[in-house]
A protein has these predicted regions:
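Hydrophobic/aromatic ligand-binding patch that stacks against planar heteroaromatic rings
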Residues: 111-113, 182, 206, 272
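Phosphate-binding glycine-rich loop
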Residues: 52-98, 104, 112-114, 122-124, ...
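Structured binding elements
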Residues: 117
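PLP-dependent aminotransferase class I/II
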Residues: 60-64, 69-73, 135, 147-159, ...
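N-terminal "arm"/small-domain region of PLP-dependent enzymes with the aminotransferase-like
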Residues: 1-52, 383-384
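Active-site phosphate-binding strand-loop segment of PLP-dependent enzymes
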Residues: 128-226, 233, 237-238
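Anion (oxyanion) recognition and catalysis
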Residues: 114, 180, 184, 343
Length: 389
């Protein structure tokens, strides 16, 4: 690609991005927290109460707000989305068993599988989205696995395949219903990694509620942040009570005795973190609407662009946490030049997640033929997607 084309491409993308963003900001990150006066007010109330650790009214307030948004009776707050994932895998017990993980995900997903004693097996995303490709997954299962004594086993390794992780990538709701049907056919559990997808809905169900367990992240770059934090969504009360006990150091409830009945974890969210989240979630619908407006502006302005495009979602209502822009195939070689150009102009876009099967610590993990995830990584950039008033 010649320098004239590269320069014209970079200028075109920069110009269009700027048209979508407020002009009174000196630099733009992919996603920054929305810390309004309301948030500071709730934080001050929490500090005044002195309840800043693992108990306090803000844990209950944030939990109730999430129950109303998500439509689940059973939600636990954790100290990170990664902890929530670990707890889900620990609860279904994946020790020495394989777990299907999309290669297009954040590193916390396979890390949590390994920390819980499992072995990730990576599969591709679809051409039309960054989410797991159900048809590709089914073909991979047919070729590589068989049902033996009621368990799904790898034909080569003999190991049991226990679970499929469905990642709702960048906030876009995956077709979880189809994957759950496929999982049932192979006697597999399904865990939903909805880390960035709070507010995303498909088939009138909030992400994280269709499978046995789902997780949300409240990291600093999420649509609602608690600084660090996460949540576990449960379908069954039994799982909820089990995990609640384990993440609370397995302490036996008593007014004054301090006793424990198993080796537990301390993975709860602190009240002060919950206060930070509650101060934002009060305005959740307003935030969602602003995010969707920004996404639509991006879609409109890049709809007939010569160089790039935005993948549009089908049959789902998404929170538009992060909007991703993709170069057309013939301009793939301009990817790094474009990112560098935009960063030099104070628009701090990022690459997409590098596919997990390409990372050095996972290079020996089994995986399907992965084409779409690699192409998306090579052509995609995450645009400034913060909540702009």
């Amino acid at each position: 690609m010649n320098d004239v084309v590269t320069y014209d491409l970079c200028k075109s993308v920069l110009r269009n991005i700027k048209k979508c963003l407020p002009s009174n900001i000196s630099q733009y990150s992919v996603h920054e927290p929305n810390l309004s006066t309301k948030v500071k007010k709730e934080l001050n109330k929490c500090l005044s109460s002195t309840h800043v650790s693992s108990s306090g009214k803000y844990i209950d307030k944030l939990s109730e707000s999430l129950k109303n948004i998500i439509g689940s009776k059973y939600i636990l707050l954790t100290n990170s989305g990664t902890s929530a994932l670990f707890c889900a895998f620990n609860e279904i017990d994946i020790t020495n068993q394989e777990v299907i993980v999309p290669s297009m995900t954040f590193v916390a997903t396979p890390n949590s599988v390994i920390h819980a004693g499992g072995m990730p097996v990576f599969v591709d995303c679809s051409k039309s989205s960054l989410n797991i490709d159900k048809d590709d997954l089914e073909k991979y299962l047919i070729v590589n696995y068989k049902i033996s004594n009621g368990k799904c086993k790898n034909k080569k390794t003999g190991r049991v395949l226990k679970c499929i992780v469905v990642v709702h990538a960048y906030g876009e709701a995956a077709n979880i219903n189809l994957i759950c049907k496929l999982a049932k056919k192979y006697n597999l559990e399904v865990i939903e990694d909805a880390a960035g997808a709070l507010g995303s809905v498909r088939s009138n169900k909030h992400v994280g509620t269709v499978s046995r367990m789902g997780i949300i992240s409240f990291n600093g770059n999420k649509i609602i942040t608690t600084g660090m934090g996460g949540a576990l969504i449960f379908k069954y009360k039994k799982d909820y009570e089990s995990v609640k006990h384990k993440i609370s150091t397995a302490r036996i409830q008593h007014n004054w005795k301090v006793e424990h009945d198993m080796v537990g974890y301390n993975l709860r969210m602190a009240n002060i973190n919950a206060a930070l989240g509650y101060g934002q979630i009060i305005d959740f619908e307003k935030i969602l609407n602003k995010k969707r407006e920004l996404y639509q502006r991006y879609c409109d302005i890049f709809s007939n662009n010569k160089y790039c495009y935005i993948k549009k979602s089908d049959n789902s209502s998404n929170n538009n946490w992060v909007t991703n822009l993709f170069l057309k195939d013939e301009y793939l070689n301009n990817h790094q030049s474009l990112i560098n150009y935009l960063q030099n102009h104070k628009i701090f876009v990022r690459e997409l997640w590098k596919p997990m099967h390409l990372l050095p610590m996972f290079e020996k993990c089994r995986h399907s033929r992965i084409i779409n995830a690699v192409k998306s990584w090579q052509t995609g950039i995450s645009l400034p997607s913060s909540y702009y008033k």
